[in-house]
Amino acid sequence: VDSLARALGASDLLADTGAAVRRFPMAITPYYASLIRRFDESDPIFAMAVPHGGEVVDPPFLSDDPLEEEHDSPVPNLVHRYRDRALLLVPSTCAMYCRHCTRKRVAGQQESAITDAELAVAVGYLRDHPEIHDVILSGGDPLTLPTERLEQILQAVRAVETIDVIRIGSRTPVTMPMRITHRLVTMLRRYSPIWINTHFNHPVELTPESMEACGRIVDAGMPLGNQSVLLHGVNDDAQVLEKLFRGLVRNRVRPYYLFQCDLVRGVERFRTPLSKGIEIMEYLRGRVSGIAIPTFVVDAPGGGGKIPLLPNYIVSMSPTHTVLRNFEGRMVSYPEPMERHDSTPAAAPHAGVATVFELCRGTATTLGPDDHGGCTAHGGGARRAACEVSDTTPGSPGAVSRRREPSRWSGYGTEDWSGLRPARRVSRPRALRGGAGGV
């Protein structure tokens, strides 16, 4: 903190940040610090990078791990929440520690990276779960690893035949663009298909250096997306985000997600009402090309996963017509087909999981919160000791309750892990490492 204050020529800059720094580490690259123009919270770069006394003030509904990633971690360094994808946390460090990070509990708390033994365990889990086709490397920031070490990790993951796509979540193109070298992207290209999601939050970050880094990634054949976070006082302004998204698309970066700030300790000052994000989405629709509009999502607390939030454009529905509202507020009537073809639901769920599909089919009359979600043999399998599924068919005397045990795993290559069985929490040699990244 003192070094930053001296570098910026603002010795009295951080009078109230001591407690915040003691709780959450601080790091900022000289490049990113050079983007600061005002030494207070009104500057977006300052707000995202410099500790603030508000980081030690927490309402009771905030937590260290609001997404319950550790509950969905069957082996160290790996999070398996969604059936077909997994998150692999490879380093615990970043070039710059964002003050709004969802993994503040671990990011930068210890400078470490996944070991060979831990990587072998994670890869073993991927091999034993062929339903996983998509692996996201996150952390920390994977692109802060030495190129040789990153290649070893990519090589190990790519060796799993059922993995179709590898994704990398990285803020390095934003905070340390000089790291995106020809040598790095040439190495990454060898493990194609690789998709990269970066993390621009404000137009000020769209510098010639960062755009050159993004261009180098795209020119190497890797699709590049962006995951922004809606931050009070930084980008909770429709015109600011319009400028950001237009600038990204102009430089071949596709806005992918706009995240509601997570319910993590230390970030209350950044949180906005959900209505603010919906308001911004309403503003963008019709003003900005569809390829420049991300999906606004809230990552549900308790490990509920991402929930998209959109303005409601349906005014009313009847068997013959649906009344819709367009981006101008004009209402139109859309005629439904003369013959209905919706007697069969569009898709069946995974076997043994009660969902809305059962209600549509008529094989169940009710669906409660304990009847689905996190109880299957894939993502969330360790979330409950057992799951109750209510199965009521028309004409039956009542609901038949059946108990399903969660999936079991054992070992995956190390003696310390061989005796473990599923539980709500999986004890492990050291804390799950973290950083910013989305699934």
Placement of each model-derived feature along the sequence:
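Intrinsically disordered, low-complexity linker/loop segments enriched in Gly/Pro
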Residues: E111, T115-E118, H129
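Iron-sulfur (Fe-S) cluster-binding segments and ferredoxin-like electron-carrier domains
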Residues: C101-A113
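A C-terminal junction/extension of Radical SAM enzymes
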Residues: K276-M317
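N-terminal pre-triad scaffold of radical SAM enzymes
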Residues: P25-I28, D72-R103
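Flexible, acidic/Gly-rich N-terminal and inter-domain linker regions that tether
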Residues: V1-H80
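Radical SAM enzyme core and accessory elements
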Residues: V1-T29, P319-V439
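Conserved AdoMet/S-adenosylmethionine-binding subsite of the radical SAM
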Residues: A120-D134, L143-V288
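Short, electropositive alpha-helical surface patch
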Residues: L150-V157, L310-S318
